[in-house]
A protein has these predicted regions:
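Phosphate-handling catalytic cores of nucleic-acid transaction enzymes
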Residues: 2-464
């Protein structure tokens, strides 16, 4: 077993070294997203789209990650252990100022699904027109014309939905059991609608969907219910930095809803400059082919007309590495004093398994590996991706916390250096007319939120 592990480590090390070199190069260009998690074909697509369209690398990478997840949908699951299965469901938010090129990367990544939905809609309209013609006939006339006596109403196949109620979404999902993606240009419209009908019920619907829990929708217009055994709905959209605080209103902070969202917030210092470079013709074709490969995957359907997903377990070395990571991650949770951050960490332990599945299937789609099991390289890449989203979540929490500060408190935070002593904090507080006891309470209340206590009398700012 030791020899096997040694051989595995020897073969994987060059890939890990190459991944780190790629990510270092990406960081030098201003992006923190670990693009090395993707197969070489997708890395090239991201690079070309970034250089030709000036789309921020973080946005295009996150949009592509979500598109891959949607392409997989309910066809594959990751099995961590017996009875513990994870779907590749992602809730993704691209954060930025107006004009930060948030929407265009989404349009690029989702175009293959848009094209598919468009063609399927045309086909549906043709089929529905014929269906209506048949329904205008009597049953006898239909049989005489060689038609089915009781024609089946056609179903519209699709991947994408926009503004829709849980009831409407359940109806669409029942016809598209492979899975859906809620794509909304402004995520604020999504969560502002949570209380539009039944108080809080829509939010509970999305909490259940995240965990792929069975959903039952009782339609007002029918005596029958819509029963979805294992729902798959990913969500992606954009949100402006200045309205982030809207996302944390109500129970969304206390019930863990906000902790389920993956945030992408690149540190864009300048507005993107136009590039006169044209996107090579093959880039869109290559991306279309990758998603089409996922769309074309055959799904096994059982006698109950439910999808039987292909379940991927982990190789022994992959599982060992994932457990090692989780134990280290748990130590971070144990040492964390902020309950909100701990809750975020707990959701990331779920997400990392989903990332492993998406990364393995992306590599398989591009011909870089098989899909018999999730291997060590996919786990290593998922770990780096999880670290990225952990840092993004902490940055978002800091923004939310700073939005709740008084002008006096904000001034003190702004004037404190990245690392400071209690004496330095008192000096800054005195300059801003804050009493010593008030300062000490402010520091203590914000340990793990705005500040980190390094040792007695010494602190550091978390978001510096």
């Amino acid at each position: 077993m030791t020899a096997l592990n040694n051989n595995k480590e020897t073969s994987i090390n060059p890939m890990i070294i190459m991944d780190k070199a790629i990510d270092m190069s990406t960081r030098l260009s201003g992006s923190q997203f670990p693009v090395s998690i993707f197969p070489a074909k997708i890395q090239r697509i991201i690079k070309e789209v970034h250089e030709c369209h000036s789309f921020p690398t973080d946005y295009i990478s996150a949009a592509i990650l979500t598109a891959l997840a949607v392409g997989i949908g309910n066809t594959h699951l990751a099995q961590m252990k017996q009875g513990w299965l994870e779907s590749p469901i992602l809730y993704m938010a691209l954060i930025g100022r107006p004009g930060a090129n948030k929407s265009h990367p989404l349009s690029f990544a989702m175009k293959p699904f848009l094209d598919y939905d468009y063609e399927q809609n045309k086909l549906f309209e043709e089929q529905y027109s014929k269906f209506e013609e048949k329904m205008c006939m009597s049953r006898k006339e239909r049989i005489e014309n060689g038609e089915d006596g009781f024609p089946q109403e056609p179903v519209r196949k699709r991947f994408l939905v926009s503004d829709v109620t849980p009831e409407g979404l359940s109806y669409i999902h029942a016809q598209n059991k492979r899975g859906l993606c809620l794509w909304t240009d402004e995520l604020s419209a999504w969560f502002k609608n949570f209380n539009r009908y039944n108080n809080g019920s829509e939010e509970q619907f999305w909490l259940s969907i995240f965990s792929a829990k069975t959903t039952i929708s009782d339609r007002r217009s029918s005596k029958s219910s819509i029963f979805i055994k294992r729902p798959y709905i990913s969500v992606i959209g954009t949100i402006q930095k200045k309205i982030l605080s809207e996302l944390a209103k109500g129970e969304r902070s206390s019930n863990g809803f906000i902790d389920r969202i993956l945030f992408v917030m690149p540190n864009l210092q300048q507005k993107a400059r136009w590039s006169d470079r044209e996107l090579p013709d093959n880039i869109e074709r290559d991306w279309q082919a990758i998603i089409q490969h996922l769309i074309d995957m055959e799904c096994q359907i059982n006698e109950q007309q439910e999808i039987e997903p292909h379940v991927l377990s982990f190789t022994e070395e992959a599982k060992a590495r994932l457990y090692e990571w989780q134990h280290h991650f748990s130590e971070q949770c144990d040492n964390e004093t902020n309950d909100t951050i701990v809750s975020i960490y707990c959701k990331l332990e779920i997400y990392i398994i989903r990332f492993c599945l998406i990364i393995q299937l992306a590599r398989w789609t591009c011909g870089e590996c098989d899909k018999e099991a999730i291997d060590l390289l996919s786990v290593e890449r998922a770990i780096r991706l999880t670290e990225y989203f952990k840092n993004s979540a902490i940055s978002v929490q800091n923004i939310l916390n700073e939005n709740m500060l008084t002008a006096q408190q904000q001034a003190i935070v702004n004037h404190l250096p990245a690392t400071f002593t209690t004496a330095q904090a008192h000096d800054v507080a005195k300059e801003n007319d804050m009493k010593p006891r008030t300062l000490e309470r402010f520091l203590n209340d914000n340990i793990g939120v705005l500040f980190r206590k390094e040792k007695h009398g010494e602190y550091s700012k978390i978001n510096s």
